[in-house]
Amino acid sequence: MRVADFSFELPDSLIARHPLAERHGSRLLVLDGPSGELAHKQFTDLLEYLRPGDLMVFNNTRVIPARLFGQKASGGKLEVLVERVLDSHRVLAHVRASKAPKEGAQILIDGGGEAEMVARHDTLFELRFSEEVLPLLERVGHMPLPPYIDRPDEGADRERYQTVYAERAGAVAAPTAGLHFDEALLEKIAAKGVERAFVTLHVGAGTFQPVRVDKIEDHTMHKEWLEVSQDVVDAVAACRARGGRVIAVGTTSVRSLESAARDGVLKAFSGDTDIFIFPGRPFHVVDCLVTNFHLPESTLLMLVSAFAGYPETMAAYAAAVEQGYRFFSYGDAMFITRNPAPRGPEDQA
């Protein structure tokens, strides 16, 4: 299976670089996986597709202001993007500088704060800060907007590049399907008899890394930390017992649930995952998916293709481009019902 099979043309004008005035103001492209039928809706129309007894699973990770600017004590400017918080004072981070800092180098953070480069782990740098990391990031850090947004972060991004139910700090990218939900919509969903549960997956910067191989099977996924609690396992079991559907809000919720059910049975799990879902891989838990539109040739587009079927997904994306949908993190959304017999690119005769 070739990465190039997942390419599509996207006009630059369709990349959403700012959020809409209202979270729920986005459009919603509904894809019925079994039939391939499309419906063009507003995000608030999602209520029409939910049933009493369904279970919606959200990712409650909280985006940290993970981007720092500063300089080495020796002089050169640099940019730090925290990838993972290791403990109260240490992080793994990407460092951009004209010359990479050496072990023992001191880093002076703009706005106040210092760090020492402790060790290098492949492309990541282990940094130890002179004070607690999370309060420092909240004070002087910048929201880590994705590269394709292509603008400096603004004050409003602290609120809008964050879900309203974000709770557990640790992500350096938002679980963007959740950005469409405001408190009023969540209340309407609950009033309809739809249950909710929360997993945690701390989204890493690796989610934006391009696939650098020609064949999908040769790709190695980045690792991210997740937790699926016993409460979630019990909620899924109760949903199944009453005939409801499990609806994942975002690909991170899909990856969390399917990581915890790799042997076919959902179990409580806490730890790293490198699960790579592409056409041909079965789904054990998720029945429906709320998701944004993803980058060409990305692992997330491959996940959606595995869920809905490759021809159905690519046809939906072509329709979205034609109809002027807004793409990526601050863009519009899809609601997808799983295709029970999805076809891959190799099935296109």
UniProtKB/Swiss-Prot annotation:
Main location: cytoplasm
InterPro entries hit by this protein: QueA, QueA_dom1, QueA_dom2, QueA_sf
GO cellular component, one term: cytoplasm
Keywords: Cytoplasm, Queuosine biosynthesis, S-adenosyl-L-methionine, Transferase
Gene Ontology MF: a single term: S-adenosylmethionine:tRNA ribosyltransferase-isomerase activity
Enzyme Commission code: 2.4.99.17
Function: Transfers and isomerizes the ribose moiety from AdoMet to the 7-aminomethyl group of 7-deazaguanine (preQ1-tRNA) to give epoxyqueuosine (oQ-tRNA).
Family assignment from sequence similarity: Belongs to the QueA family.
Protein's name according to its UniProt entry: S-adenosylmethionine:tRNA ribosyltransferase-isomerase
